[in-house]
């Protein structure tokens, strides 16, 4: 798979209030995230999901936000400081070869990979890194945009997820996306 990186300016579009109305992050995340959890947002961009996660995990929780683009992470950090949530958030820049989360092995309660797996050069390695970071029984909300990824393409990614050890718990309805809840 070739590397496609979301242009930085698209990060601002992803934060659109219209997107929030159509794809409400709180409604999507509330069934899975509780106070005190450690949550990984892999492919965080400017934090459309990260800031709501930080509110949901509360003061005793922790959100690890990882993205390939330093500018995206810097923008998210500014937004987190402005929202007063930066104390419960960690910001990391990864590389095309590593998600940079090896130190999290077995410590993450829940993870998100929203509209990102189709952009990484090695989806299997990406999913394996998330699997390793999760605690036993931990979950991954995996979603890809239907406009970029076909149903067959998403099923291929689910096969990769199974190959690294994930179990598919259920599919999810998220507007214009192929989505599933996976578990370790």
Residue ranges: model-predicted function:
Residues 164, 173-184:
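Core SAM-dependent methyltransferase catalytic element
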Residues 19-35:
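Conserved alpha-helix/loop element of class I SAM-dependent methyltransferases that forms part
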Residues 37, 97-111:
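A short acidic, Gly/Pro-enriched loop at the edge of an enzyme's catalytic core
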Residues 124-136:
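A short glycine-rich, Lys/Arg-flanked "PGG" loop and its adjoining helix->strand segment in the class I
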Residues 108-121:
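A short SAM/SAH-binding and catalytic strip from SAM-dependent methyltransferases
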